Amino acid sequence: MLHFLIRPSTRCAGSPHFNSTSSFLRKRLQSKTILSKRLGFQFRPSSTNVLAEVSTATSGFNPSWWPYALIQNTAYTINVYAGAPWWVSIILTTLGVRLALTPVMIASFRNSTKLSVIQPEMKKELEAIKTAKLDNDQLALNQHSIALRGIYLKHNVNPFAIFILPLTQSAVFFSFFYAIRKMSRLSVDGFTTGGLAWFKDLSIPDPYCILPIINAGLMFSGMQMNRANTASTIGNSTNWRTFFFLCCLLSPLLTAKLPAAIFMYWIPSSLFNIVQGYILKNPVVRSKLGFAPLPSIIEKQPSGFTLITNPIKSLKEFYKGVRDGFKTQYEQLQKDVSRRAVATTSASTIRPNSHYKKLKELNRSKKNSKKQSN
């Protein structure tokens, strides 16, 4: 009944890595030994073997507060205390972290939807600020900057808050990636047999490349769901949709050599995004969370559909769109630089020279008047 804490292992003792979790388990096992002597029976056949199992099971773990170490220790704790296989431990750790990040996600989505609503007002003021900078008009620049800050305060939004969620998710992704990759390379107890179905060994890649393909499809679905929920201008552009689809299409080729354990994080995380997207599409949920309502017209054709039916034409259009976009930006940049140069020259050169000429003419007229008076 009480022997589920540690599973048997065939490895020997003496691992150099022994963290605080292991010392805690050692104390628990010592107390069990004393209790078994008093009761007259043993909880385990041999406490020495159990201690060896604790030592070898923690190979590669560190008592650190870095995010990757916390992820490793959390998954290990679930594996040891619940007796769950490693694929279940990684999935439960993933879901726990994603649930912990839910408040950050809600705050970021609320801010993004408010920004999408006030985008016309923001665009007007930003264009005015840009024009004032090019014309070197400090008065207009200050006026429109104050007006833009007033819009942010009126609607209670922060334009920099949209970066919090992507940065947090990136940090979590790289922490999981590093933690699981390190676990797959080290001799962690039960990792080579802690898989499921055709991927029993979590430390090696999927031999049939099924997990990378499933992950690519779920990533694409999650991107579609988030694009529809935020309804942002960038996410709905044709070029960006094609680019995202190409990334998902090529991801199985780029992730085929990754250990199968990484997909025990990636696939549940993508499923979490899809479920989260379906929940956030509900108008009642959006109103309760303070989200702006979705636009009435959302493109129903899924992005990438044209790429599948006619890939050559779609790739040509994608290349043409990217090229035209860079060309337009370059031409606009040249115009802005020229306009800025003219404004700076007129402010620093033309006005002082004209003023100097007026002073010179005034002094000359004074001298002429003195000569005439004499």
Swiss-Prot record:
Ranges of the Mitochondrial intermembrane topological domain: 98-159, 264-374
Q: Tell me a GO cellular component.
A: mitochondrion
A GO term for molecular function: membrane insertase activity
Residues spanning the membrane: 77-97, 160-180, 243-263
InterPro entries the record matches: YidC/ALB3/OXA1/COX18, YidC/Oxa/ALB_C
**What GO terms in the biological process aspect are recorded for it?**
protein insertion into mitochondrial inner membrane from matrix
Side Mitochondrial matrix, residues: 181-242
The membrane-topology field of this record reads:
Multi-pass membrane protein
| Pfam families named among the record's database cross-references | 60KD_IMP
Annotated localization = Mitochondrion inner membrane
Domain of life of the organism in this record?
Eukaryota
Function, please?
Required for the insertion of integral membrane proteins into the mitochondrial inner membrane. Essential for the activity and assembly of cytochrome c oxidase. Not essential for viability, while oxa102 is essential. When both genes are deleted the cell is non-viable, suggesting that oxa101 act as a back-up for oxa102.
The record's comment on protein family reads: Belongs to the OXA1/ALB3/YidC family.
For this entry, the protein name equals Mitochondrial inner membrane protein oxa1-1
Organism of derivation: Schizosaccharomyces pombe (strain 972 / ATCC 24843) (Fission yeast)
